Swiss-Prot record:
Disulfide bonds: none annotated. One of its GO terms (cellular component) is cytoplasm. ATP binds at residues 202-209. The keyword Cell cycle applies. This is Kinesin-like protein KIP2. Present with 656 molecules/cell in log phase SD medium. It is found in: Cytoplasm, Cytoskeleton. CDD domains: KISc_CENP_E. Required for assembly of the mitotic spindle. Residues 1-28, 36-63, 414-441 have a biased composition (Low complexity). Residues 127-139 have a biased composition (Polar residues). Its main location: cytoplasm.
Amino acid sequence: MIQKMSPSLRRPSTRSSSGSSNIPQSPSVRSTSSFSNLTRNSIRSTSNSGSQSISASSTRSNSPLRSVSAKSDPFLHPGRIRIRRSDSINNNSRKNDTYTGSITVTIRPKPRSVGTSRDHVGLKSPRYSQPRSNSHHGSNTFVRDPWFITNDKTIVHEEIGEFKFDHVFASHCTNLEVYERTSKPMIDKLLMGFNATIFAYGMTGSGKTFTMSGNEQELGLIPLSVSYLFTNIMEQSMNGDKKFDVIISYLEIYNERIYDLLESGLEESGSRISTPSRLYMSKSNSNGLGVELKIRDDSQYGVKVIGLTERRCESSEELLRWIAVGDKSRKIGETDYNARSSRSHAIVLIRLTSTNVKNGTSRSSTLSLCDLAGSERATGQQERRKEGSFINKSLLALGTVISKLSADKMNSVGSNIPSPSASGSSSSSGNATNNGTSPSNHIPYRDSKLTRLLQPALSGDSIVTTICTVDTRNDAAAETMNTLRFASRAKNVALHVSKKSIISNGNNDGDKDRTIELLRRQLEEQRRMISELKNRSNIGEPLTKSSNESTYKDIKATGNDGDPNLALMRAENRVLKYKLENCEKLLDKDVVDLQDSEIMEIVEMLPFEVGTLLETKFQGLESQIRQYRKYTQKLEDKIMALEKSGHTAMSLTGCDGTEVIELQKMLERKDKMIEALQSAKRLRDRALKPLINTQQSPHPVVDNDK
């Protein structure tokens, strides 16, 4: 029995096909300014803001920027459009460097523009699906859809209940409206320095690819986002303070293998950044799928696909041209539910690097646009069955990761899954809750290539928005329920994202300023040392009075009139030169013949090698003794001269007593040196005593040796 329609479920008015003509025809940088003009000039017709019915959709404005559910939004001021972002973004907009919130989840019913194969057609209304034959009366009757939308945040099932999300679009909304709610705020965050991730999730044939890429009549989120990105780049580059680099990569995950969609693209000079590394690639498959790429951990990006082609783009047209090249290589096939079904997960990676021209610092952030393949039932075709199994496996792994990530928050706040009103659906809803609150702390990111690539985004390195596409028809109720369960869990995943760090390029004005400051500090330190040197009248170790006086004269002569650094270097060189001369005198071994006749006789008695070695050793010792004696005599003469002169007290006072102390230390070292040499001589005599006794003995051994 068909229930009586509520006011919110009345048949919507048909929409004019000419409404899509207002959509901008080109996503280039030159034409994207029309988007902001449309936003400023679009004025919706006023209506009663307290009305709870959406039957007024027949009087909606034809502006492509008008939100479908704007009339039911009590926060909108009448007379002008106000694009309201998700609550999680608005609540945390005060924090410029960090973002704290959750994954933004939006629901989009299957668009009417999406065609299907065989007898499946697009959704004709938000409440009714295709007509079916009535056997009793022989006429066609509409089968009512079990899902309907009450406002811009709620989607309701007749038996299960209602689901609330950040935003629920009407079935007749345009891609431009979806872009205004989802993608545009993410581009703003990208320009601020945050990583941003947008992915479409849903069953096959529900409109994911149409939402992300669009068609010839209606642009999708990817071209609209690219246009808005380059428009902001042009505006921020006009003052000359910043410059931007945009690099694109495009990959797909087909049967749990990663392939580069830009590798076989047309070569353009200077556009290719990196050549795929064969070290981390598998060999090309025999079926022409290209070279499989591998995922590796990366300190900067979390994970990185090794060998993925990167193309530098100067305009939105160039970037969209590369995306079109990748789309031609993407795996697409016909299924029971869709004439052109995506058989792989496709991810567009747009890396934006902004450089501050003044200080040379740069910041890189990445926009990830993911068009996931849809879950589907088993089919009779062997190839499609194999593809579907890999797709379902990766989506199951993604659901498991989302479930475990949302477990903590679901325990404290409660699941977003509504309580069923029928006993038949109680077990399914309860199982969903139990899966989301699994006590395990392990997050199985490595169960699939998809979750491995999304690991940095889901673990807090990116702001995430998901667009869950659903089919509200009765025969797709099970798949729609699974999608909404996934969306409910995703809404509970907490995010705490920080801006990407600023990187210094090394040869910028900031480093120059730091170098200048370092040199300035060194100069101040040298000036301070010179000032202390003038006050103390010495530098370093005062070896002699003449050296101190000459050093002071050099500094005095050049300290005021010349460069103070030059005076300091001259003084240091003089001290070092004096030290070097003394060391050379002490270490040089002269070749003066030995004067001790007894030692000479002993040396001649020994074998040639031993005698030569002993003679050389004695020569060195005698040379050192002579040098020490000369040095000691010089110091003694210096002391005697100071004592005899009448300026001894004045000299000592001028040197602050330091020279006397140093001279006394030198005398002590001299005494120790003499004592050490005497000790060495005693050891030598003790060592030579057996040889002398042997020489004086009448034993015939000595005569035989000779």
